[in-house]
Amino acid sequence: MLFHTRIAAAIAALSVSTLALAAGPAVVKGPGENPGCFKPWTDQTKYFQWPAKKGPYRIALANGFVGNTWRIQMIKMAKAYAATPEMKGNIKEFKIVSTGTDVAAQIASIDNFINSGYDAIITIAVNPTAFAPVIKRANAAGVVLVPFDNVLDSEEVMQVNEDQTGLGTAYGEWMIKHLPKKTGKLLEVRGLPGNSVDRDRHVGFRKVVEAPGNKFEIVEVVGNWDDGTAQKVVADAVAVHKKFDGMIVQGGSTGAVRALIDAKHPMIPVAGESENGFRKLCAERAKDGLICNSLGQSPGLVAISMKAAVAALQGKVMPQLISVPIPQTQHPNFKAGVNYF
């Protein structure tokens, strides 16, 4: 009888353990691990804790779009960070796949990593709303899923990002500062359609420039965060509209400015991303009237996401949404060897 009781107790304990794992992380009280690195988004951000696993871990990066310099730099940074002494001892295997802009293909790649027994998957989501089922599948398998950059419209998963709406707001506020009459024609060069970063920056920018009292005419084009595409669509916009008073570029800022130069368009205020080539042009063309604000998404988000995934696997208390500061440099502070190379 005692034997059967012990067996029943063991089965019950195993069932509870499995259920807890299947339910995903527990919601716990903060503060979390290393708040200097893993800063909670607000004081209302909740905290997660996963059951601790023994390392080293199998970690995957499920990337989507790979067609611009930012993504290429991000992937190189991920590989480099995985090889650092800090991470090398914690990682048994690190694999990267890029599936393009197809939502189903990216979800399938995440499912494949889950089914293959990976411990954590970091991802730049192609779509912010389509991932609820795969979050449940990751939780059921005890896999830590960490979206970053293009994050999800969900509070059920740990995420890492900069404030994209705030970044769009900063674009708009800076532009109005340099166009004090609050009127004129603005060119808005958007990013990759369907992504949360593109959506949130657009919303933040429009909220400022379309506020009561402003009388801007806004021409919107899609540059896909890519220099070549941005250069073409800006050239086409200049050919049609002839003159703009200001331009904001979510990505591909170097190409966008080159289009203005090639068209012999007067230099105007440009709020763009943090690409090195853009900053170099801002410094070189300042004498011609090019006034720039360079702020944007750091490819270093991938390293923070990898570090967060490992901390979560170790059972550390983690914020559900981790806030990363926005790097920014603006005219006249562009300096070779300091903030561009």
What are these regions (language model features)?
Residues C37-K46, Q106, V160-L186, D200, ...:
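Hydrophobic alpha-helical segments within soluble ligand-binding/sensing domains
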Residues T84-T99, K185-E188, V209-G228:
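Short beta-strand elements in bilobed, periplasmic/extracellular small-molecule ligand-binding domains
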Residues P31-A52, P56-M77, Y81, P85, ...:
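Extracytoplasmic "Venus flytrap"
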Residues M1-P56, I114-N115, K136-V143:
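Short, low-complexity disordered leader/linker segments with a strong preference
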Residues P128-G166, N276-D288:
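Flexible loop/hinge segments that line or gate small-molecule binding clefts
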Residues D111, N115, D119-A140, F205, ...:
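Hydrophobic alpha-helical
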Residues G24-Y57, V209, Q297-F341:
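Hinge/cleft segment of the Venus flytrap/periplasmic-binding protein
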Residues I59-N63, G67, A78-K79, Y171-E220, ...:
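An alpha-beta-alpha
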